[in-house]
């Protein structure tokens, strides 16, 4: 059918773009790694220092590769129909517990409030969304500051709000925050973390926004807000057995 052909064409375009972007992005850490190895072989740097630098480069390349695979997985799951219903609140609390050592390391005053929320989504998507947003907030929250997570439902949507007390974001940067591999994305390092979040939210027919909190003329922090639709309530429109008789 036309719908199937459109989905196949979309998938093919996405795969071509992914291969092009992936090859371009991996070229940089591989070039850096080669330079570091050559410097070590020539004795330009101390062996211990060279090993530390090489290890850091490998870690960055591994993170980048994993994030690119996550982007590809989002598209793969998007093509599947009828995702299961998943408790967003349970996933969110599990991720918060998972990164609690990072929160403690930065001595953050961390608070989390959740309400039961059932979302039509693969658990992996909600987990990846929560992990990327929380990691981003923890990394950029000033040590010893407050970081709050709030998940609430209004009956039609569930809203996740993550509020930090960091420096916020520049207006110029905000326009390209959710683009894969965006240059100058200082809040995500490789420029993929928020792009993954954006793709997941789009796949779930929701919205995501990053907004500076301002008091007077001073930025006091950043709010990351995700809104996802709740499943429509089931309606029994079929006739009962008694009515059929």
Task: Provide a role label for each language-model segment.
Residues 1-14:
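Amphipathic coiled-coil signaling helices used for dimeric signal transmission
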Residues 76-81, 114, 118-124:
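Conserved micro-motifs of the catalytic ATP-binding
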Residues 102-112:
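Short conserved segments within the C-terminal catalytic ATPase subdomain
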Residues 169-181:
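Short conserved segment of the HATPase_c
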């Amino acid at each position: 059918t036309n719908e199937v052909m459109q989905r196949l064409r979309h998938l093919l375009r996405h795969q071509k773009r992914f291969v092009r972007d992936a090859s371009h992005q991996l070229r940089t850490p591989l070039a850096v790694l080669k330079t570091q190895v050559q410097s070590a072989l020539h004795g330009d740097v101390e062996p211990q220092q060279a090993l530390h630098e090489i290890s850091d480069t490998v870690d960055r390349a591994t993170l980048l590769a994993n994030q690119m695979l996550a982007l590809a997985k989002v598209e793969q799951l998007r093509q599947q129909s009828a995702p299961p219903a998943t408790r967003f609140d349970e996933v969110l609390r599990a991720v918060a517990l998972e990164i609690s050592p990072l929160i403690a390391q930065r001595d953050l005053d961390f608070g989390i409030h959740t309400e039961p929320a059932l979302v039509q989504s693969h658990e992996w998507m909600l987990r990846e969304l929560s992990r990327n947003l929380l990691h981003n907030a923890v990394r950029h929250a000033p040590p010893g500051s407050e970081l709050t997570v709030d998940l609430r439902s209004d009956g039609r949507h569930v809203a996740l709000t993550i509020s930090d007390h960091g420096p916020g974001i520049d207006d110029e940067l905000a326009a390209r925050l959710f683009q894969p591999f965006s240059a100058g994305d200082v809040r995500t390092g490789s420029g993929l973390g928020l792009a993954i979040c954006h793709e997941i939210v789009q796949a779930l027919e929701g919205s995501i926004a990053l907004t500076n909190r301002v008091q007077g003329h001073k930025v006091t922090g950043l709010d990351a807000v995700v809104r996802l639709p709740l499943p429509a309530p089931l309606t029994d429109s079929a006739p009962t057995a008694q009515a059929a008789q």
